[in-house]
Amino acid sequence: MGQKTNPTGLRLGIIRGWDSNWYSDDNEPAILLEDTKLREYLQARLRNGGLSNVIIERTPKRILLTLNTSRPGVIIGKGGEQIELLREELKKITNKEVQINVSEIKRPEMDASLVGQNIAQQLEARVSFRRAMKTAISSAIRMGAKGIKIKCAGRLGGAEMARTEQYKEGRVPLHTLRADIDYANTTANTIYGSIGVSVWIFKGEIIGDVDLSPNVQSKQQQESEPSRKRGGGRNDRQSRRKRRTRNQ
């Protein structure tokens, strides 16, 4: 069932690299748990910092974190004081030296994680879910996305019975492995309960060799061919008849 497949996991090792990059002989569960705790702490600590995802690289004595964010100034702070404070906090948690790199996301409207977070914040502020979803879709298409799908599930609008609503525009291929699909899901905690928000953004097709090393932001994208217009309306059929009549 293609619609049930996680687009990120399906493309790992093909066109998508890993967010955790390290090697361990026998301590893998503990390190994996520490990675999860680091990501949860950073998401809570930088809730207003526009944090999309965290790439973790490890050496025996050092941890390198790359924070992909749309608001680097909020994370770095004036004169770098905020990022130094964050580094000291993470050092106490991990008992290792921590190096933090901040990478700016130029187009947050095309980042699935940031789009989902934005919709979740609007739902928590009691904005209409339809308005939030349609605004996000129009912004992504305007910024160059080939297709986008957004799904919200829960007690939408305070309804007694939970339901699922989704909006889609453009192409969102689920089984094309060369399709660059950015996927994320988040949760909006409203007064009526939790609402799940899932976002799929199709950015284009990647052709050729792909560099799967960490922190590679630029990817080679193949522009998809424009769809050919097929069929036609009443006016099109009438114009074809007129052309045939003139030729006769």
Give the predicted meaning of each segment.
Residues M1-Q248:
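RNA-contacting regions in translation and RNA-metabolism proteins
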